[in-house]
Amino acid sequence: MTKPVLVLVGHGMVGHHFLEQCVSRDLHQQYRIVVFCEERYAAYDRVHLTEYFAGRSAESLSLVEGDFFTQHGIELRLSESVASIDREARVVRDAFGHETHWDKLVLATGSYPFVPPVPGHNLEGCFVYRTLDDLDQIAARAATARRGVVIGGGLLGLEAANALKQLGLETHVVEFAPNLMAVQLDNGGAAMLREKISELGVGVHTSKATTEIVRNEQGLQLNFRDGSSLATDMLVFSAGIRPQDALARSGGLSVGERGGICIDNQCRTSDPDVLAIGECALWENKIYGLVAPGYQMAARRAATLAGEAGSFSGADMSTKLKLLGVDVASFGDAQGRTPGCQSYQWTHGPQQVYKKIVVSADGKNLLGGVLVGDAGDYATLLQMMLNGMALPKHPESLILPALEGSRPKALGVAALPDGAQICSCHNVSKGDICQAVSGGAGDMAAIKSRTKAATGCGGCSALVKQVMEYQLAEQGVEVKKDICEHFPWSRQEIYHLVRVNHIRTFEQLIARYGQGHGCEVCKPLVASVLASCWNEYLLKPAHLPLQDTNDRYFANIQKDGTYSVVPRMAAGEVTPDGLIAIGQIAKRYQLYSKVTGGQRIDLFGARLEQLPAIWRELAEAGFETGHAYGKSLRTVKSCVGSTWCRYGVQDSTGLAVTLEHRYKGLRAPHKIKMAVSGCTRECAEAQGKDIGVIATEKGWNLYVCGNGGMKPRHADLFASDLDEATLIRSIDRLLMFYIRTADRLQRTSTWMDNLEGGVDYLREMILEDSLGIGEELEQEMARVVESYQCEWQTTLNDPQRLALFRSYVNSDEPDETVQRQTLRGQPQLAPFAAQGEPALPSRPWQAICDLDAIPQQAGIGARLGERQIALFRFGDQVYALDNLEPGSEANVLSRGLLGDAGGEPIVISPLYKQRIRLRDGRQCDGGEQAVRAWPVKVENGKVWVGNQQLLARAEAS
């Protein structure tokens, strides 16, 4: 018996998802399936299309697994477009006139990019951003261009702008509307997005109507209605999409007034045997331009063909994504257009975070919201909206930082109904995930495999994990609290192992109590524990591979790969000569200078190779390191106290100096801040610090476990009218007990709140020595105090360590991408305009350095011709990758931590903690190409690097 024929026109993301849904229902056995694909590539991931410019190949973007078509007997016709539909004859004709019969016809023709019909839109140098072929043309043009302009400031336009930036172009975005992402964001969110994108060096031009595009001697020029103009070398149109409905029109199918193939709840067109799904389909006068609704249409249509009940009833258009490195989320009625609705907004200007929620008139339901700069609340808020969950009495608490005594605002997954949609891309509910866990799926890999949750855009990953862990706990399965895959221990247990067994190195610890090579979680944690216990020099060969970039170079890394320098100024005291020396150094090295809230001076913009020279001059002027880079004591802030102030009752400055010099260099689970006030007027703000001291007529009041920041907490009064010796003894005990028992990266405030008994328990333990360990804690602190060393002074006296402070092991040239401009009389970051791709050496192999020049289990920067690369020494192997950290403009990958993930050697980038495989430069999770990888060989102790990237060599072969 001859099978009926199902023809699918269009093989994009939605089209392929339809095929997968058909296969899962065995429809490939009921139908002969023929697929027409206009492009030369089978379906690929358009969501991550920009990664193509980061070195990801067309093959890695493909959505087609292995021999999918052969295995399931589906016929794929690549580079074949359908020219017409003959509904009476039930055939489609391709561009060559060949006819293919169909019994069911599915149109998944997608959309095409909208190009405004302005004069000059078709000039050479004008492109659209839609397909891999489009991207190849853009890349070819960008190789000889300096500046690129994108017309369109929506989702697609900002994606295209990101692509141009990755190609090294000076990038501008032109938008007709007053705001970027005008559909998704309100005015406040759009303003914050614009501010953040502008800081990245992207020019933003809103309210610009392009009247013409002309060619001149310099290239292209856009002329605007307001009389202004903008010159460019190339232009990319990414101003939205239009449904690809021409085929349906020619076949006499019903289409919308503004385009789109009209469909019903079963995705049927005006001809019941012709179906339409995805961006070409118009459902209730609405075109869905996101992949998740298209997937839902595809799944619904396949289910209907298989005889299952159900219908397509619309889809949530909420979205969460990262645009040019900026987290953005929009859901529901983001613009607040519902009659009578109320909105709450919160802005954190310094951190460039904007949050807004819209609630119903009665304040009972969440209707929508906008998040820019921090989208961490997206999953919680979206579930509350989709499931109609009751709002708290004060809805604003959902977006405000948690205050003292308030409960966490995160929504417990136990409160979600089983039908709550967790993954919109694949329509996976909470119940689906719980069922998968009950069926034996006990980790994220198994959940993804069984349900496909978190395999689409990935935005639901955190919530999927929460549901999985909830169900595991419900089944009585212990959810491990191991710090990472390398150590089945908590931080407290690791501290105990190190202290009791006198373990002095990471290698000793992992050999006895762990496995593998470590990661960005356990290495810095163990480094901190070792320093708290033994206080050895951090750059000893055994300790260097554990240090994050700030501790490895004793400075705070900034967004452009330079560092900030903070000399210690105990209690804020500084001599006139000291001030003059700091000013002269800042001027000599062109450093941006700023007074900090901790009463110190911060100098920004020091290149890696400049740090030793800067610190040599600071040391000669009497300064030592301020430990602004470490999880350690930062500052002890003070007022002038009784020395100068008429209200002061004690010498607060003198005590602050004593405390700062006592605890400087103390490593802890998190940073420690202190303050001393000379009277109850509290000018030093001691009650907002980890350790706060306020003078009284009889002595000192001690306050503990406060902090400022995003979640401020008022410190608790711990003891009153203490003499100085008792005060210091109490602080010694409390800090060492905190170091012993706190979790990883846990501030003192959270630590105390999690202690059973809270501050009362601490008083008994510290003041009354209820556990009998007071003297032991004091002795541990005494050893730390006695073993203090200024890390910079030690480094300056060690030529071998100084050799690590260089940007390139084989060149003394500075990083050309670090540029400065003057603003308010001071040096500031300036965008770097790349002049095409850096030149590679003409010879196949270039000698870079001696093997011993690369630290064991660490990396160092180098130059391959003019290209910046990172060399990593992992055991007996040497690897070479591009030095540019993905998603940044900083050549800093060489300063990342080395480790492994499931035995796979990886580097963890220093700025944004991205896990990248050393062998091929791909992302550890997902396999997307992150950076280029280069061949390496070691001969006679010399490291050589090849001039043809590994990916290109592999594809050529």
Swiss-Prot record:
Cofactors, names only: siroheme; [2Fe-2S] cluster; [4Fe-4S] cluster; FAD
UniProt cofactor note: Binds 1 siroheme per subunit. Binds 1 [2Fe-2S] cluster per subunit.
Q: Where does siroheme bind?
A: 683
Name one molecular function that GO assigns to this entry. 4 iron, 4 sulfur cluster binding
Q: Give the matching Gene3D superfamilies.
A: 3.30.390.30, BFD-like [2Fe-2S]-binding domain (1.10.10.1100), FAD/NAD(P)-binding domain (3.50.50.60), Rieske [2Fe-2S] iron-sulphur domain (2.102.10.10), Sulfite Reductase Hemoprotein, domain 1 (3.30.413.10)
Question: Can you tell which superkingdom this protein's organism belongs to?
Answer: Bacteria
Question: Which residues are recorded as binding NAD(+)?
Answer: 193-225
Heme is among the record's keywords = yes
* This protein's record includes keyword Metal-binding: yes
This protein's UniProt keywords: 2Fe-2S, 4Fe-4S, FAD, Flavoprotein, Heme, Iron, Iron-sulfur, Metal-binding, NADP, Nitrate assimilation, Oxidoreductase
Matches recorded under InterPro entries: BFD-like_2Fe2S-bd_dom, BFD-like_2Fe2S-bd_dom_sf, FAD/NAD-bd_sf, FAD/NAD-binding_dom, FAD/NAD-linked_Rdtase_dimer_sf, NasD-like, NiRdtase/SiRdtase_haem-b_fer, Nit/Sulf_reduc_fer-like_dom_sf
Q: Which processes are annotated in GO (biological process)?
A: nitrate assimilation
Q: Which reaction does it catalyse?
A: NH4(+) + 3 NADP(+) + 2 H2O = nitrite + 3 NADPH + 5 H(+); NH4(+) + 3 NAD(+) + 2 H2O = nitrite + 3 NADH + 5 H(+)
* Residues reported in the UniProt entry to bind [4Fe-4S] cluster: 639, 645, 679, 683
Give the UniProt family note. Answer: Belongs to the nitrite and sulfite reductase 4Fe-4S domain family.
- This protein's name: Nitrite reductase [NAD(P)H] large subunit
Recall the taxonomic lineage recorded for the source organism.
Bacteria, Pseudomonadati, Pseudomonadota, Gammaproteobacteria, Enterobacterales
